[in-house]
Amino acid sequence: MTKQPEDWLDDVPGDDIEDEDDEIIWVSKSEIKRDAEELKRLGAELVDLGKNALDKIPLDADLRDAIELAQRIKMEGRRRQLQLIGKMLRQRDVEPIRQALDKLKNRHNQQVVLFHKLEHLRDRLIVEGDDAVAEVLTLWPHADRQQLRSLIRNAKKEKEGNKPPKSARQIFQYLRELAENEG
């Protein structure tokens, strides 16, 4: 921020009144460039999101239009559009956008972890049988023991006969339904 000639008089050394709001914070040019580059990366993440995910992020109309345009553009035009989005983000409060984006990423990561746990449980059900069924019933007391045993029996037969794992997929789907109904 450069000072105008009329502001020079405010810096008289004998002036004991200091206004803390007028304090100038010096920021290096490199830091400004790093911040701009970070906002450009945030803009690129927003462009890579799908329409449903974008609906969950608080964006104003101008920024949303710029993002949708960048999604349609290819090559060099896309790079220029990403720079424009970065510039638009510099003029806005990006904290709500970052929080919504982190929330989306976190939800996806939690879902992946849940799916891995359910796959592991499904494999244990097929290998161990009744011991693992008892564990499933302790996790989800409303689970149907008879249906689960039937699916496990069919999955074992399919595995022995080198058939496609249709029942194993059904076990996974059933476990996923139980987990979704719980939460």
Swiss-Prot record:
Entry keyword set: Cytoplasm, Ribosome biogenesis, RNA-binding, rRNA-binding
Keyword RNA-binding: yes
Gene3D superfamilies named in the record: PSPTO4464-like domains
Subcellular location: Cytoplasm
Pfam families hit by this protein: DarP
Keyword Metal-binding: no
Annotated SUPFAM superfamilies: PSPTO4464-like (SSF158710)
Family in the record: Belongs to the DarP family.
Protein name: Dual-action ribosomal maturation protein DarP
Native species: Salmonella typhimurium (strain LT2 / SGSC1412 / ATCC 700720)
